[in-house]
Amino acid sequence: FIDEYEHALSRFRADSLVTHIGNAEHGGHFDFPDWAGPLFDLYDALHAATRGAIDPCVGEDLIRLGYDPALSFTVEADAGERLGALHGRAVWGRDVVRSSGTTLVTRSPVHVDFGACGKGYLVDSLGGLLTDSELSRTSHVKSAETTNPTCQSSTSDSKRESAAPEFVIDAGGDLLARTNKPIRVALEDPDDPSCAVGVALIGDGAFCASAPSRRHWEVAVNEQTHLAIHHLLNAIDGLPVQQTEATWVAVRSASFGGYPTAVADGLATALFVADPNELSSTFAFDCATLDVDRHATISAGFPGRFF
């Protein structure tokens, strides 16, 4: 499934649908798998909630800033004049239009990037496969017990068979946990990945973090000046966000149609460009943030604390 997922959504694969959209000189109709529907729904919601600051069309800005499929980390000479929706870059819902749920329609080449929610959505999909597999196995066990009266299970075995599977999926900053006993998760210090600034407890739901510290590069403006660039952009102006250092988001399992990790992943990015109070009118979540002055904020229901 991971290969199928990347074949549809990865802008780093030459054979992906996303790459075909970026190479289509006159645009076209691009049919994605049915499983992509909820992901596109989530991007619709994030785009609206952030007033366009979260936009899959930011892929073009990332390329201009050097975060391209070749990972050149070289900023284009005219990038400053072409970044963002303010300078005419394509916009989700206008230049990329959804048709029939999972068909994207364009009229020209558009470089899209589904990284804000994509990894979290993959985690949820894998979690769904684990759950479905266990439910299918349990169903077969119960069927055998019904058709074979001599096959008896103890009370504890029956409870174990009917219980939802326990698992933790760790996708490097994106966690999905279904455990009876909460697990402790360190809040990584964005200035020093060997240290933590806090700790959280996660048991049933998703927990995602975002920070520019692990994906950043420098470009020389001149001999004296070097500009720090990272992948967390405001899609309106196309520039890397400078005021926030790290975000952490917790979302319960039932959120957004059963895609809590995708929601947490997207919100961890959205908190770089939007106020949490505005986002809370659309999404149910708890969060913590750390700004460039090391000032921490934490919501009342966040399942953790700063040191």
How would you name each of these model-derived features?
Residues F1-F307:
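Mature catalytic core of soluble alpha/beta enzymes
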